[in-house]
């Protein structure tokens, strides 16, 4: 019974169908916006390292994990097994929670940077906050639809 469920519409895509199915299409946008977050924070020279260290960890970790999952899905490493659907749902739920915490901390750090930091650092961190919240939204949407797929598998 399990192989029939795995071969249904609720299984993970493989090959280039990853780029045409929802929510897996969101991998591309998570990759782009997550990459922008850590690039912007790194280019601002991490003025508040205690807070922004967590933001950097979350953004780089999620960037690398998203890239790894995307490559594994493209090469079809999951083989249609339900355990990969569970992994996908768990990863995106954890990533959404991590990104939410990182976004709040980055916004707090940026508010505190209004005075005493360069104009360039301040504006790079404003951009990082915006992209961090966009990445959070993408991971939340992906998590919700991954949980729906997990429940139906």
UniProtKB/Swiss-Prot annotation:
Transmembrane regions listed in the UniProt entry: 25-46, 54-75, 93-114, 126-147
Extracellular side: 47-53, 115-125
Subcellular location, principal: membrane
Record GO cellular component, one term: membrane raft
Sequence ranges on the Cytoplasmic membrane side: 1-24, 76-92, 148-153
PANTHER family tied to this protein: MARVEL-CONTAINING POTENTIAL LIPID RAFT-ASSOCIATED PROTEIN (PTHR22776), MYELIN AND LYMPHOCYTE PROTEIN (PTHR22776:SF12)
Protein name (Swiss-Prot/TrEMBL): Myelin and lymphocyte protein
Originating organism: Canis lupus familiaris (Dog)
Name of the gene: MAL
């Amino acid at each position: 019974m399990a192989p029939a469920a795995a071969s249904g519409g609720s299984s993970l895509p493989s090959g280039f169908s990853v780029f045409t199915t929802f929510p897996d299409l969101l991998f591309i946008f998570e990759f782009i916006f997550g990459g922008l977050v850590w690039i912007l924070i790194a280019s601002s020279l991490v003025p508040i390292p205690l807070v922004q260290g967590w933001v950097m960890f979350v953004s780089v970790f999620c960037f690398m994990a998203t890239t790894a999952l995307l490559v594994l899905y493209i090469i079809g490493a999951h083989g249609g097994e339900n355990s990969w659907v569970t992994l996908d749902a768990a990863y995106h739920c954890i990533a959404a929670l991590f990104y939410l915490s990182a976004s709040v901390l980055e916004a707090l750090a940026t508010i505190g940077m209004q005075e005493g930091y360069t104009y360039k650092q301040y504006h790079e961190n404003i951009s990082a906050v915006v992209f961090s919240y966009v990445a959070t939204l993408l991971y939340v949407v992906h998590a919700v639809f991954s949980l729906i797929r997990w429940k139906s598998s």
